[in-house]
């Protein structure tokens, strides 16, 4: 069975300073993200064993663990690509037009996305996603690593609101962290994800 691996980053840990510290990025990548990768591989191995033993209770437990850790791995893999030392400013082209159509303007989108991030209770993510059924952009709060996400949604932009993503630098002032995040958003990556999402067929099939 193929195992999941920790991806390399496109930039050095300190490249996002002063907006996100190198210390945070190094710990975030080598400790937290690495833990999710180990967790998903461990869950897969235990799930395979549970299925071989027809242990249904263990199957359900490890499917739950798999969803959590795989969610963490996927979310962080998108997170690193969503960031760039050359980021910031605003999107252009088709993505900019889609944001204007869905939210009224970029400023209104930014305010709504920031409110989703700052208002999240506990741990999770704020997400800009593409609804493949309704062919529209949506923002929503993702709880923990995998909860509250409708099927058929493709994530385009995410901000990590777990405390490990900001507390060493911003303490409990989440709003300052979210404000700093906008300075390093890699809109080229978000645009690429949008183009890929909109090129797909309808996400769910209705009989």
UniProtKB/Swiss-Prot annotation:
Pfam short name (any one): Sod_Fe_N
Reactions the enzyme catalyzes: 2 superoxide + 2 H(+) = H2O2 + O2
Main location, first listed in the record: secreted
GO cellular component term, pick one: extracellular region
EC id: 1.15.1.1
Coiled coil: none
GO molecular function: metal ion binding; superoxide dismutase activity
Location(s) in or outside the cell: Secreted
Cofactor, free-text remark: Binds 1 Mn(2+) ion per subunit.
Alphabetical keyword list: Manganese, Metal-binding, Oxidoreductase, Secreted
Names of the cofactor(s): Mn(2+)
Binding positions (Mn(2+)): 28, 76, 160, 164
Similarity annotation: Belongs to the iron/manganese superoxide dismutase family.
Its biological purpose: Destroys superoxide anion radicals which are normally produced within the cells and which are toxic to biological systems.
Protein known as: Superoxide dismutase [Mn]
The organism of origin for this protein: Mycolicibacterium paratuberculosis (strain ATCC BAA-968 / K-10) (Mycobacterium paratuberculosis)
């Amino acid at each position: 069975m193929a195992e999941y691996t920790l991806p390399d980053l496109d930039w050095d840990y300190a490249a996002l300073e002063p907006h996100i510290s190198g210390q945070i990025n190094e710990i975030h990548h080598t400790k937290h993200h690495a833990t999710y990768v180990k967790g998903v591989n461990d869950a897969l191995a235990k799930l395979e064993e549970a299925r071989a033993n027809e242990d249904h209770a263990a199957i359900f437990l490890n499917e739950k663990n798999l969803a959590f850790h795989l969610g963490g791995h996927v979310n962080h893999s998108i997170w690193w690509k969503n960031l760039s030392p050359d980021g910031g400013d605003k999107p252009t082209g088709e993505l900019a037009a889609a944001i204007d159509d869905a939210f009224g303007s970029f400023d209104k989108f930014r305010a709504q996305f920031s409110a989703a991030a700052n208002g999240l209770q506990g741990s999770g993510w704020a997400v800009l996603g593409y609804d493949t059924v309704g062919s529209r952009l949506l923002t929503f709060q993702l709880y923990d690593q995998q909860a509250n996400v409708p099927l058929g949604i493709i994530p385009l932009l995410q901000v990590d609101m777990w405390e490990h993503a900001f507390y060493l630098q911003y303490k409990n002032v989440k709003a300052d962290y979210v404000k700093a995040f906008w300075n390093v958003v890699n809109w080229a990556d978000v645009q690429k994800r949008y183009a890929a999402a909109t090129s797909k067929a309808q996400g769910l099939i209705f009989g």
